[in-house]
Amino acid sequence: ATFSEAPPGDPKAGEKIFKTKCAZCHTVZKGAGHKQGPNLHGLFGRQSGTTAGYSYSTGNKNKAVNWGZZTLYEYLLNPKKYIPGTKMVFPGLKKPZZRADLISYLKQATSQE
């Protein structure tokens, strides 16, 4: 399934998902530091493995995917399958609505100045 077939995302629900499943390892605010995972500010349109100051796996650097709705939708289903060798231990979100909600939240949260 593709992002275009996903239900419309709810950023409020996506924020809850981020706080419970992602915030332990990621930040979204501009200028916030890296944690176990990289800061996600400016994520949309950025190439994987290119955030300054974060040490990525070779798999992430070599994948060279441009992050957007479609690529995140596929990645968040099964990160280790999408980018073999990724350091991200998160198993993924199987429910299409959860992925759509999270992407909707990330679009807002990672673009705020």
Curated annotation (Swiss-Prot):
GO terms for molecular function: electron transfer activity; heme binding; metal ion binding. Keywords: Acetylation, Electron transport, Heme, Iron, Metal-binding, Methylation, Mitochondrion, Respiratory chain, Transport. PROSITE patterns: CYTC. Binds 1 heme c group covalently per subunit. Heme c binds at residues 22, 25-26, 88. InterPro entries: Cyt_c-like_dom (IPR009056), Cyt_c-like_dom_sf (IPR036909), Cyt_c_1A/1B (IPR002327). The modification N6,N6,N6-trimethyllysine is found at residues 80, 94. SUPFAM superfamilies: Cytochrome c. Its main location: mitochondrion. It is found in: Mitochondrion intermembrane space. GO terms for cellular component: mitochondrial intermembrane space. The modification N-acetylalanine is found at residue 1. The keyword Metal-binding applies. Transmembrane segments: none annotated. Electron carrier protein. The oxidized form of the cytochrome c heme group can accept an electron from the heme group of the cytochrome c1 subunit of cytochrome reductase. Cytochrome c then transfers this electron to the cytochrome oxidase complex, the final protein carrier in the mitochondrial electron-transport chain. PANTHER family: CYTOCHROME C. There is one amide at position 24 or 29, probably one at 69 or 70, and one at 97 or 98. Belongs to the cytochrome c family. This is Cytochrome c. It comes from Ginkgo biloba. The lineage of its organism: Eukaryota, Viridiplantae, Streptophyta, Embryophyta, Tracheophyta.
